[in-house]
Amino acid sequence: MRVILLGAPGAGKGTQAQLIMEHFGIPQISTGDMLRAAVKAGTPLGLQAKDIMASGGLVSDDLIIALVKERISSSDCSNGFLFDGFPRTIPQAEALLEADVHIDHVIEIHVPDEEIVARLSGRRVHEASGRVYHIIHNAPRVEGHDDVTGEPLVQRPDDHEATVRKRLAVYHEQTEPLVGFYQKLVAEGKVKAPKYTRINGIGSVDSIRQQLLDVLR
């Protein structure tokens, strides 16, 4: 079970990724975690990445792909894996294909932009405890105040509407083209083409989870 999960920030990928990992017993692989682990372990690839990052450079796609191949050869990936935030661009997806890294499923969790803006910009947080509210879906008993302590709630900078819209713009420019890339692979009947599925990301966590499980079974 080798899965790539796509979707805009705020589409609910993190929640569903956790459920997939637990259900199928596969690890979630993020390039950030992978880089940090390789650097800490002092592997040859990790040392290369460390030198590049220390000089302020960007780690090349070739090195990322080499790290990916190294990571998925680990025993915990024997039953599969879930890529988190990778690939981000078409060149990375092409490199993954050329490196003969087989993917079974590419699943896009689709949520319209305005719904994502409403989801994220409506969040309010009690900083001391980490309790999260939403002005519409999970409002505090007293507007703007934590239910337990009565202390003021804050809106995190990442949740400001302008910031959310900027993140969505980056997603549409850099990552959304991957949807077309994988759809084209399927349409052309490529041998290595994964199964591509778009699911509706509006609904309860359980209903979206069921859609995912129906696809992955």
UniProtKB/Swiss-Prot annotation:
Chief place of localization: cytoplasm
Enzyme's top EC category: transferase
Protein name stated in the entry: Adenylate kinase
GO molecular function ontology, one term from the record: ATP binding
Compartment(s) where it occurs, according to its Swiss-Prot or TrEMBL record: Cytoplasm
Function: Catalyzes the reversible transfer of the terminal phosphate group between ATP and AMP. Plays an important role in cellular energy homeostasis and in adenine nucleotide metabolism.
Family, as annotated: Belongs to the adenylate kinase family.
One cellular-component annotation, GO: cytoplasm
Oligomeric and partner information: Monomer.
Bridged cysteine pairs (disulfide): none
Pathway given in the UniProt record: Purine metabolism; AMP biosynthesis via salvage pathway; AMP from ADP: step 1/1
